A protein has these predicted regions:
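C-terminal edge strands of extracellular/lumenal beta-sandwich accessory domains
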Residues: 1, 14-62, 137
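Surface-exposed, short loops/turns at beta-strand junctions within beta-sandwich domains
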Residues: 17-19, 111-116, 194-203
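Hydrophobic beta-strand segments within extracellular beta-sandwich modules
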Residues: 23-25, 118-120, 206
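Conserved structural position at the C-terminal beta-strand
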Residues: 27, 122-124, 210
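Aromatic/hydrophobic beta-strand junction motif of beta-rich domains
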Residues: 67-73, 108, 155-159
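Conserved Ser/Thr-centered positions that define the repeating blades of beta-propeller domains
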Residues: 83-86, 123, 169-173
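Recognizes extended acidic, P/S/T-rich segments that occur
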Residues: 90-106, 167-201, 213-214
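Pro/Thr/Ser/Gly-rich low-complexity, intrinsically disordered linker/stalk tracts
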Residues: 137-162, 199-200, 214-219
Length: 219
């Protein structure tokens, strides 16, 4: 909130849309007990840059679900244009052209397509930013464990449209460790037999993510 501050000994002022030229700053002390007193002046420039902060690349999105597109930008009410591509930037589809830039987010319904060449772009007044790398849109398989033996584990899952392979992971000491990757065979269900790396562990966590070429979907 803009206003005069005569209480604190550190003050911030802003100049919106400054014109080119020379600026003079006059500093007057308020309730100074004795003087004169030294002071310091620092400044910075805030440009009209737009930074897309999500999705930035590598994410796995699910067709039909809602995702919050997020960005950082100057705080004004001018509209921005949000777009996405599913063919590595050869063509772009407009998501919206009427969202104010100062909302900093937009609730986007992910399109019902399968692609590993997806990016999101935001633009305004000739300034734009887009995802740093491609993201993937593909469904999430339903996974179950048929049986666990001291030496092996049998995992199966429902297949999803457009997947070229499936990555099976198991919880390690801290992270989900990739155990194997199985090529898609076109069936409605698939399975994998993996060696049990922790035969003394009585329970564990498993996940299966669909892959489109080398890109992972959500687990």
């Amino acid at each position: 909130i803009r206003g005069t501050d005569s209480l604190n000994n550190m003050e911030q002022i802003t100049i919106k849309n400054p014109a080119a030229g020379v600026y003079n700053l006059l500093v007057n002390g308020t309730s100074v007990p004795f003087g004169p007193q030294d002071y310091w002046l620092t400044y910075e420039y805030n440009y009209e840059d737009i930074t897309l902060t999500y999705p930035i690349g590598g994410e796995g999105l699910v067709p039909g679900e809602f995702e919050l597109i997020r960005w950082d930008a100057p705080q004004d009410s001018l509209p921005c244009v949000l777009e996405y591509t599913t063919d590595n930037g050869q063509s772009w589809v407009i998501i919206t052209s009427s969202t104010s830039i100062n909302t900093n987010f937009y609730n986007w319904q992910v399109p019902s397509v399968i692609s590993d060449e997806v990016r999101v772009r935001i633009s305004r007044n000739g300034i734009s930013d887009e995802s740093d790398a491609n993201l993937t849109i593909v469904d999430v398989p339903n996974v179950s464990v048929s049986w666990i033996c001291p030496d092996s584990i049998y995992v199966n899952w429902s297949t999803v449209a457009g997947a070229t392979s499936y990555e099976v992971s198991m919880l390690g000491q801290k992270y989900m460790d990739s155990m194997t990757t199985v090529a898609s065979n076109g069936n409605t269900t698939q399975s994998a037999l993996i060696l049990n790396p922790n035969p003394n562990v009585l329970d564990s966590w498993f996940s299966v993510c669909a892959k489109k070429n080398d890109s992972r979907g959500r687990r």
